């Protein structure tokens, strides 16, 4: 098995191309073969939507940009932090130059003060697809139009003009990101639980507070009460562990919402495990790809180096500026990078010149990012709808971007049946498709990651770069402390604004 995995890691790209040749003898010209007129080669499938996921640092944006450039496509960002205006370094947001070269939708969509969740993003992503493919938005027929529809329409119209695309041309939606919940909601649909009504939310909160006020046996009485509403909810609450008031309240909200509507079919569909409204239910030909690093050790080193680069580019300065100006979104405070920066800068025992604390912050940031990349790989290995596309890290950046984009293109040219067969552990001829080989290799390499040796590249303790960043960190810490003191000072002691 170990020998097999090693061979797979070295030969994935060649094997993938030969497998696709066998599957698609009549496939269209490669995206990297220019037509005689020099025009972009258009994909033949009118309703094709491409989804590109992958762990942080694997090169998703570069691959997506290559595909968009050849197919008159636009990137639909699936990143929970990039949707907010103001954030940049900590969100790894594309630069203005990159966005001019490849239009990005759902970036800079909302202000820091707004709440923007998976349901909001899914709604906006679906609207983007309809507008890019020149479909009449479903919401117009249903009378529940997206409140951001006008903004999305304008963003797409501006991007068409910038790129010189015809106003009526159907553009290719290329959804790119690593936020797992967002992609799950988009591809597989919303969870089976009903969205609670405002009345149900208020009633549940009042009832929870009443039970919480009953000292010793409040939890038991609350469980008994919810169980009495319906056997479905009894089964649900019996699985709760500890005194999980949050999940109990959520169950109450769903119960009140469903029972108030007096519709037995709603009860039947609750907690069925089935998700409603996946992309395919809208008539799209959805092709999902996970960019899988061929060498996890090398990829993890790339992640560590990327964390250092973010610090050197000014992550601490950006975090401080956003916090002081009250423009740091609540979502960002929980995101890797911003969260560690705030914890470090606002620590209770803070003092200037503390090299050990700064060194610990660097370690915490890198460790959290590595763990997130690992979680992304674990998550998508369990999702059989994503084709694992090996990214050969030993190649130059340009070569691996070209090879990865070409493989995605070729898989999009397969018939639906051949594409789905390429996702299976074994095809009709008894061969192990490349996607499954990549899954196996990724999982096998994960068993050896305990041997990974963390190293610094520029921010070694005592280095010139380390000392420079420590000085910047001290300045940020002082600014945040002064900001906090000003906020908590009595009104008469606060400086007057002229």
State where each predicted segment sits.
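Phosphate/pyrophosphate-binding catalytic cores of soluble transferases and nucleic-acid-acting enzymes
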Residues: 32-498
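Compositionally biased, intrinsically disordered low-complexity segments enriched
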Residues: 4, 19, 25-28, 144, ...
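N-terminal chloroplast transit peptides
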Residues: 1-42
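Detector for intrinsically disordered, low-structure N-terminal pre-sequences
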Residues: 6-7, 13, 27, 40, ...
